[in-house]
Structure formats: C-alpha cells, structure tokens
C-alpha cells in the first residue's frame, strides 16, 4: 500500500508571481490568484498546509466587472458602533481604494480560518504598475485570455 507523502515546511519552494489586473474580470482573476495562493497549481498540494506562492497584483484600479455592477455592487463595512454601517458602491470604492476590491474578492475565496489568514498575507495588491518587490524577481502569471475577453 502506498503512503501519502506530506511535504515538510523546509521542502516547500515558494515562487513570486506577478499578475496584471488591467481589463481582467474581477471574479475570474480572483479565482486564479486564490488557487495559486493556496498552492493548488502544485503537485505537492496539501489541504492543511500552506504550500502556495506569493502573488503580486498590479493595476488593481483597472479591474472590470460586467453589467451594471459598477453602480449596483455594494461593499459594506461596520465600525462596531451602533449605526456604524457604511455602504459603498463598486464605482466609489474603485476611485477611493481600488486595492480593497481585489483583496476582498480573493480573501472570500480562501479558507475562513487561520490557514486562510496566513495565505492572505502572501497577497500583495497595488493600484499602479509599480511595486516594491522587484528584488524577488516575480514571474509573470498568465491568466486565461478567453476569460478576460468575455
């Protein structure tokens, strides 16, 4: 009988990937990035370990959504105080904090536990093309071109 191999923490090789979000659909980009953060693109994927890679997303301010979502999609947050609910549309949040839109979409696709919080720390999102991670020599991650054309 074969035994399942569990990779040791030292044997996990973490890569850095660069994703350009310009003209990409939000949900399709988020699923691909969440999969890489989780490590599902590797043969050594283990559900209970962090085997994923680091991902840098640039041009978060140029992400797309379809239909009337720019005006109708709502983002809610609460201060914790009575009456502290704040509601903002996609359009308004994209002007103010475009990184938060991408972060929130990807975070929702990660596990909602301590492992998910650890995976989320490996995501870096920037609104322009500049990022401070050139020393890591990130590889460009090609997303499915058919997904962005829809």
UniProtKB/Swiss-Prot annotation:
Concerning its family, UniProt says: Belongs to the universal ribosomal protein uL13 family.
Pfam families registered for this protein in UniProt: Ribosomal_L13 (PF00572)
Stretches for region Disordered: 130-150
Report if keyword Magnesium is assigned.
Answer: no
Q: Which GO terms describe its molecular function?
A: mRNA binding; structural constituent of ribosome
Q: What does this protein do?
A: This protein is one of the early assembly proteins of the 50S ribosomal subunit, although it is not seen to bind rRNA by itself. It is important during the early stages of 50S assembly.
Instruction: Report the GO terms under cellular component.
Output: cytosolic large ribosomal subunit
The gene behind this protein is rplM
Look up and give the organism this protein is from: Synechococcus sp. (strain CC9311)
Which GO biological process annotations does it have? negative regulation of translation; translation
Record keyword Ribonucleoprotein present:
yes
Listed under subunit, the entry gives: Part of the 50S ribosomal subunit.
Residues that span the membrane, as ranges: none
Taxonomic superkingdom: Bacteria
**Keywords linked to the UniProt accession:** Ribonucleoprotein, Ribosomal protein
Organism lineage string: Bacteria, Bacillati, Cyanobacteriota, Cyanophyceae, Synechococcales
InterPro entries in the record = Ribosomal_uL13, Ribosomal_uL13_bac-type, Ribosomal_uL13_CS, Ribosomal_uL13_sf
Q: What is this protein called?
A: Large ribosomal subunit protein uL13
User: Which PROSITE patterns does UniProt cross-reference here?
Assistant: RIBOSOMAL_L13 (PS00783)
